[in-house]
Regions:
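Active-site Tyr-X3-Lys motif and surrounding loop/helix of classical short-chain dehydrogenase/reductase
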Residues: 68-71, 93-97, 101-108
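Conserved NAD(P)H cofactor-binding loop of Rossmann-fold oxidoreductase domains
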Residues: 86-91
Length: 259
């Protein structure tokens, strides 16, 4: 069975992806900052699904973390067949008043770490003519996002980067899928403070498990862009239905702080 490495595996969509892949029989390497959560998840998955689960405690916003992860995997002589770049976070704030350190950390995690891990693991996949890569973006990738300007921009990068790579990887045996969920019931809302936005407050959203199941199926089928949910598909294609200059206004109304 193909071995997978999953970043941001200690909560939300990442944790559910770990559960979905373990259920399918994949040996796993889990990456996140919390050893306590990773250890608990390892014990759960090994007991329930009888698969091999290892983990690495790393903060991917730190400069050398990606190389250290790659080196640790090489030292264990584990071949990675599936790379899931799930780690990321957002911040609900107008740009002028946002904390620069948090924004910089977001860029490092959402863009730099994802790109670096892909660069490190991709050559081996190409060499053996098999690999599956899932980069987790968002429906936010398809339009600018006032009050979460940097987050939306990082996800636009993930989508553009992944689609470009999919063009390079044709006939290599390696496929790259971009998972684009909308708002999801997870800890993302709390971490980003997004629960205060008009679009989110008081509403119910899909579970992390439903997103993870859809993402895994789409990745294994080699789907290039996987948008979860009919409503999210409409939002992702908003530019097709209305002039682009209107899109910022519509998104601004959706994203502003609820009154």
């Amino acid at each position: 069975m193909k071995t997978a490495i999953i970043t941001g595996a200690s909560a939300g969509i990442g944790m559910e992806l770990a559960r979905v892949l373990a259920k399918a029989g994949h040996p796993l390497i889990l990456v996140a900052r919390s050893e306590e959560k990773l250890s608990a998840l390892k014990n759960e998955l090994e007991k329930k699904h009888r698969v091999s689960v290892d983990y690495l405690v790393k903060d991917l916003s730190e400069k050398n973390a990606c190389q250290e992860i790659f080196d640790a995997v090489q030292l264990k002589k584990i071949e990675i067949d599936i790379l899931i770049n799930n780690a990321g976070f957002g911040d609900f704030s107008d740009f002028a008043n946002a904390d620069w350190e948090k924004l910089n950390q977001m860029i490092q995690l959402n863009i730099t770490a994802l790109t670096h891990l892909t660069k490190l693991f991709l050559p081996q996949m190409i060499a053996k003519r098999y690999g599956r890569i899932m980069n987790v973006a968002s429906v936010a990738a398809f339009q600018p996002g006032p009050y979460m300007a940097v987050y939306f921009a990082t996800k636009a990068y993930v989508l553009s980067f992944s689609e470009a790579l999919s063009g390079e990887l044709k006939e290599t045996g390696v496929s790259i899928s971009t998972l684009c969920p909308g708002p999801t019931e997870s800890n993302f809302m709390e971490v980003s403070n997004m629960s205060e936005s008009a679009f989110i407050k008081g509403k119910k959203f899909p579970s992390s498990l439903s997103v993870a199941e859809y993402g895994y199926k789409s990745m294994m089928q080699g789907k290039t862009v996987a948008i979860h949910g009919t409503g999210n598909y409409f939002l992702a294609n908003l530019n097709r239905f209305v002039p682009r200059k209107w899109v910022v206004g519509i998104t601004s109304k959706l994203m502003r702080k609820a009154t």
